[in-house]
Amino acid sequence: MGQKINPLGFRLGTTQSHHSLWFTQPKNYSEGLQEDQKIRDFIKNYVQKNLKISSGVEGIARIEIHKRIDLIQVIIYMGFPKLLIENRPGGIEKLQMNLQKEFNCVNRKLNITITRIAKPYGSPNILAEFIAGQLKNRVSFRKAMKKAIELTEQADTKGIQVQISGRIDGKEIARVEWIREGRVPLQTIRAKIDYCSYTVRTIYGVLGIKIWIFLDGE
């Protein structure tokens, strides 16, 4: 039987790079990893609480963390940074202050920068948030998937595959539905594929969304 592998981990060092860059002693490794996860969760929760977005899309594609002895550099890649910058004057400073307070960074300076993504809907995380918002509003899953594919076509992608699993449309038996447009060569390591898996809570239960986007290159 074929074993499924995470497309991002499979391509690390070729088309994918690490989202955390730091070194530490082996015994402190787990602490550093937990700290990274807490920082990412804190930022996502802060954005969720402070932004009342009509579309339900936070627009965070990924969060990179670079650590040095005296500095933690956090880079937030967003599709719609205006939501955080324009709607709330001093939004980044407040987030930085809250994060520093939360993690008690006494000896280390914390620096947060926001980078805008040129094509937001070419990112699977932003696309998954969009589909999740549609499903929560009880839009038909097929309609939501087709709309997502239309949005990626604007981002000049070469192929996309969307999969939704769970009690779709409130049916009693859980099932898996998927749709593919263009090419998605999962076996080719040189192919630049972006992937995300996302969980959405609906009134019928939890649904899982998986998205593979073939960007370019082979």
Swiss-Prot record:
Annotated compartments: Plastid, Chloroplast
Alphabetized InterPro entries for the sequence: KH_dom-like_a/b, KH_dom_type_2, KH_sf_prok-type, Ribosomal_S3_C_sf, Ribosomal_uS3_bac-typ, Ribosomal_uS3_C, Ribosomal_uS3_CS
Subunit structure: Part of the 30S ribosomal subunit.
Pfam family, one: Ribosomal_S3_C
PROSITE patterns: KH_TYPE_2, RIBOSOMAL_S3
GO biological process: translation
HAMAP family: Ribosomal_uS3_B
Record-annotated disulphide pairs: none
Keywords: Chloroplast, Plastid, Ribonucleoprotein, Ribosomal protein, RNA-binding, rRNA-binding
Main location: plastid
Domain KH type-2: 47-118
A GO term for molecular function: rRNA binding
Protein name: Small ribosomal subunit protein uS3c
NCBIfam families: rpsC_bact
Family: Belongs to the universal ribosomal protein uS3 family.
GO cellular component: chloroplast; cytosolic small ribosomal subunit
